[in-house]
Amino acid sequence: MLPLAFLDRIRLQLGPEYPAFLAAYDRPRAVGLRLNSLKTDRFPNLPFSTAPIPWAEHGFWYDPQARPGLHPWHEAGLYYLQEPSAMAPAELLEVQPGERVLDLCAAPGGKATQLAAKMQGQGPVSYTHLRAHATLS
């Protein structure tokens, strides 16, 4: 259950789109992986099904039950588990080899590695994650 204060604030911000926001919490979670084009130029023969993510050149949806993080190809770095929506910024930025990139929201690093792959390893990608505070529990 989401906190009521949060829901009240979101209802005010989203207006007529608020019901769609709530409905999204009832749908299954969407999970994705991204091929590491610096290590492979073809899709590996995976033991689980995938489907292309329309907005991500090397992005693929997979069934969360597949557990691709346990596969040796993940350990070898042929693909990176990444939230599908997090793949969009690097696609929209359209970086080119030789450019310089600064990623200020780089935790845990998926976008930074995606940008480096799009630059074909040519050009620096500097990354950090700024936090006003961190709480450990």
Question: What do the PLM-derived regions correspond to, one by one?
Answer:
Residues 57-95:
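Class I SAM-dependent transferase core
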Residues 129-137:
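Single conserved hydrophobic/aromatic residue that forms the stacking wall/gate
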Residues 1-59:
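N-terminal auxiliary segments of SAM/dcSAM-dependent transferases
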Residues 99-105:
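Conserved class I S-adenosyl-L-methionine
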Residues 33, 89, 105:
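Residue-level signal for inorganic ion chemistry
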Residues 123-126:
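Short beta-strand element of Class I
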Residues 108-120:
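Conserved SAM-binding loop of SAM-dependent methyltransferases across substrates and taxa
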